[in-house]
Amino acid sequence: MRASKSDRFLMSSWVKLLFVAVIMYICSAVVPMAATYEGLGFPCYFNNLVNYSALNLTVRNSAKHLTPTLFLEKPEMLVYIFWTFIVDGIAIVYYCLAAVAVYRAKHVHATTMMSMQSWIALLGSHSVLYVAILRMWSMQLFIHVLSYKHVLMAAFVYCIHFCISFAHIQSLITCNSAQWEIPLLEQHVPDNTMMESLLTRWKPVCVNLYLSTTALEMLLFSLSTMMAVGNSFYVLVSDAIFGAVNMFLALTVVWYINTEFFLVKFMRRQVGFYVGVFVGYLILLLPVIRYENAFVQANLHYIVAINISCIPILCILAIVIRVIRSDWGLCTPSAAYMPLATSAPTVDRTPTVHQKPPPLPAKTRARAKVKDISTPAPRTQYQSDHESDSEIDETQMIFI
C-alpha cells in the first residue's frame, strides 16, 4: 500500500526530530567535557560545588557564603553524568534503528491507513522525542548554572529537568495511549521483522536504563532542593541533610506505588529503577563514611545511618511485592472480559420418545369423526405453493 500524505508528513517530521535529538546529544556530550577544562568559557569547575572539608552539622546557614550541605562530590557527579550520557546514547541508537525499521516496513507491511502512525506511537512518538530533546537541553543548562555556583538557580533548573525526565519516562512506557489502545496498536506490527524485535527486546532494555537514571535523578533532585533550602533559610545543616534523605525516600515510595498501580499495566519487567535506588543509597552512604568525624561530633552518625538504611529496606520490600504480583501470579487483577469458547457448544441430538396419548371416550371419537367428514382437511404449504405455481404457468401459456 502506498503511503499517504499524512504518513509521509509523520515520517518526515519524526526523522527531523530525530536529527535534532542527535545534535542535542552531541552538545550534551561536549558541554560537560568543556566545563571540565579552564579557559573554555566556564568560570568554575562545576563538580566542586561545596567544600566538604568545612562541613559542620551543628551550625546554621550564613548568608555571607555558600554553606556546605549534602551534595554529590566529584566522583559521584562524574558517574552520574557519564551514566546519563551512556543511556542517552543507547536511546539515540534505538531511535535510529526504529527509523530504519519503519522505513523498511512501510513499503511492504503498511496495509492500513493507521499502520505507520501505530508504529511510530509504539516505538517512540513525536512528543516522546521532543521531551527527550528538552531533557538533554535542561541537563546542559544545569551544568552551565553549576559552573557559576548559583545554588538556587541550579536547584530551580534541575527541578525543571526532573519534571521533564518524569514526563519522558511516563510517555515512553505508556506510549501516550490508554491501556486498551495498546493491543490495537500492536495488531499493526508485522511478525518476524526488525520492528517486532525492537519492541519486544530493545525497547524494554532502553526503558529500564532510563528508569535507573530516573532513580539517580530523584536523588540529585532531593539534594539540590535541600541545598537550596539550607542556603536560603536559617536552618541547621543537619536538618537539610535529613530533609534530603527523607525526600529521596518519599519519592521512591511514590514511584513504587506508581509502578504497582499504573506502569505494570504497560510493562511488567521494570528492574532498572530498583538498581538505581541501590546505587543512590550507596551514593548517600559515602559521605557518612567519608566524613564520619563530622557526623560523630554532631552525634548524628547513627541517626543518619539508620535513616539512610530505610531506603534499601523499602526497595527490597518493593521488589518482593513486584515478584509476588508478577512472577507468581498472586494479587493480579482478573481480566475484565470472558474468553470466547474455542469450539461450538454441543447440541443434544438424542431422539425424544413421545408417549402415546390415552384413548378418547366413545362419544368424543364419534363427534371427531363427524367433524372430520364435514370439515375439509386444511391444505399444506406445499399444496398451496404448487397450486400457485400452476396458476402462473397457465396464465403465461394464455398470454403466449
Curated annotation (Swiss-Prot):
Species whose genome carries this gene: Human herpesvirus 8 type P (isolate GK18) (HHV-8)
Membrane-topology annotation of the record: Multi-pass membrane protein
Record family assignment: Belongs to the herpesviridae glycoprotein M family.
UniProt subcellular location: Virion membrane; Host Golgi apparatus, Host trans-Golgi network; Host endosome membrane; Host nucleus inner membrane
Topological domain ranges for the Virion surface compartment: 38-76, 135-152, 230-234, 292-300
A Pfam cross-reference name: Herpes_glycop
Intravirion side: 1-16, 98-113, 174-208, 256-270, 322-400
Name of the protein: Envelope glycoprotein M
Region described as Disordered: spans on this chain: 348-394
GO cellular component, one term: virion membrane
TM segment ranges: 17-37, 77-97, 114-134, 153-173, 209-229, 235-255, 271-291, 301-321
Keyword Translocase attributed: no
PTM characteristics: N-glycosylated.
Assigned keywords, A-Z: Disulfide bond, Glycoprotein, Host endosome, Host Golgi apparatus, Host membrane, Host nucleus, Membrane, Transmembrane, Transmembrane helix, Viral envelope protein, Virion
